[in-house]
């Protein structure tokens, strides 16, 4: 059984693949309610990781809110316009955990990021927090 093997060109690879959001049901807000969750590009993921660190390279206090920050980054309307801003992070943290985790899990899934990647960011921030 042989499968076709096609090596793509540099030009093909450098053309961004059109992002496709994943609609996450949020029935807590009413029947049929969804939040579109968009994938992060490689550049956006790198920026997200960098935001979790201070200028000294150590995780900053904001890294504790890694899930909330991921929700801000990935939840957008049907046109890709962000639903939330960084000013909403504290309020997102007050939201029902099940809803937030659903959005976080969808963001990880569509972006190809593992939950271990996010846990590592959060763990690194814990190491710098006073006991």
Regions found by a protein language model. Give the residues of each.
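Short acidic-hydrophobic surface loop/beta-edge motif
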Residues: 20-30
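Short, surface-exposed, charged amphipathic helix/loop patches that serve as local interaction elements
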Residues: 2-3, 29-131
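Extended acidic low-complexity intrinsically disordered regions
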Residues: 1-20
């Amino acid at each position: 059984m042989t499968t076709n093997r096609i090596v793509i060109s540099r030009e093909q690879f450098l053309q961004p693949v059109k992002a496709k959001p994943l609609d996450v049901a949020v029935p807590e807000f009413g029947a049929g309610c969804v939040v579109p969750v968009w994938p992060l590009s490689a550049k956006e993921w790198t920026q997200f990781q960098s935001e979790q660190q201070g200028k000294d390279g150590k995780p900053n206090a904001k890294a504790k809110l890694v899930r909330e920050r991921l929700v801000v980054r990935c939840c957008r309307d049907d046109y890709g316009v962000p639903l939330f801003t960084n000013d909403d992070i504290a309020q997102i943290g007050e939201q029902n955990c099940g809803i937030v985790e659903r959005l976080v899990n969808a963001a990880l899934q569509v972006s190809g990021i593992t939950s271990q990647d996010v846990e590592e960011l959060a763990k690194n921030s814990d190491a710098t927090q006073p006991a």
